[in-house]
């Protein structure tokens, strides 16, 4: 493996959480969208947590842009995360929620404020600065979370089923927005999803997990043509 080939690598990772063992060895190409897929409990969120630094492997390395992350706290890693519940602070307006992505202490320069306004406009939330999260729809809250990730300007974005709570119309809108933003930023996106349509529309590659192990890692086209892998067949055909 060379740093030119991938943005993120889980290099011979071993981790035990409770009674479950995880053995993860896979890479995520620079500038591509990779879908992480598998049944409930297969290790999808654990994989993201390892990349983000919320879980520490018992053995092996997490490598991001050629750097071993062993000594890097989550706040020091070049990643932004978006979760299903969007993690917005209910008592803070949307501008302030997004501003936390720039400065946790809210020490903002004029250029920081401009960057926040640009991000809000880019996700379709211009004029929402003073609104509280509770006054927004589910799709609007996810757009605010995406704006917060954008202002962090990190090269790797982790998304843990960010559209799961949205209806089909909102899902389609968020999918289109994510594609547009990826075309602009060229960042590396790792998205956990259980929707085959999301995989087809968003991802160039797929990593499929089964009981804590990688059983497929390759192109999206080849994934949907995979045969004789029971876990993949169950996912694709119910």
Curated annotation (Swiss-Prot):
Catalyses which reaction(s):
thiamine(out) + ATP + H2O = thiamine(in) + ADP + phosphate + H(+)
What name appears for this protein in its UniProt entry?
Thiamine import ATP-binding protein ThiQ
- Its biological purpose: Part of the ABC transporter complex ThiBPQ involved in thiamine import. Responsible for energy coupling to the transport system.
**Gene, per the UniProt record:** thiQ
- SMART domains per the UniProt record, alphabetical: AAA
Q: Which organism is it from?
A: Agrobacterium fabrum (strain C58 / ATCC 33970)
What compartments host this protein? Cell inner membrane
Keyword Cell cycle on this protein? Answer: no
The enzyme class is translocase
In this chain, ATP is annotated as bound at: 38-45
SUPFAM superfamilies noted in UniProt: P-loop containing nucleoside triphosphate hydrolases
């Amino acid at each position: 493996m060379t740093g030119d080939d991938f943005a993120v690598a889980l290099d011979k990772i071993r981790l035990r959480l409770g009674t479950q063992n995880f053995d993860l060895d896979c890479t995520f190409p620079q500038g591509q969208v990779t879908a992480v897929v598998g049944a409930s409990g297969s290790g999808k969120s654990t994989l993201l947590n390892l990349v983000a630094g919320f879980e520490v492997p018992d053995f092996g390395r997490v490598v991001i842009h050629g750097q071993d992350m062993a000594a890097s706290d989550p706040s020091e890693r070049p990643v932004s995360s978006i979760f299903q519940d969007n993690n917005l602070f209910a008592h803070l307006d949307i501008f302030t929620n997004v501003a936390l992505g720039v400065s946790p202490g809210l020490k903002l320069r004029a250029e920081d404020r401009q960057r926040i306004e640009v991000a809000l406009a880019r996700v379709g939330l211009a004029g929402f600065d003073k609104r509280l999260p509770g006054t927004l729809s589910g799709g609007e809250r996810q757009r605010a979370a995406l704006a917060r990730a954008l202002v962090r300007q990190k090269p790797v974005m982790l998304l843990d089923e960010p559209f799961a709570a949205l209806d089909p119309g909102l899902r389609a809108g968020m999918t289109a927005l994510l594609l547009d933003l990826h075309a602009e930023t060229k960042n590396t996106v790792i998205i956990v999803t259980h929707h085959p349509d999301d995989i087809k529309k968003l991802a160039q590659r797929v990593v499929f997990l089964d009981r804590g192990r990688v059983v497929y890692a390759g192109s999206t086209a080849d994934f949907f043509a995979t045969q004789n892998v029971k876990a993949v067949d169950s996912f694709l055909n119910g």
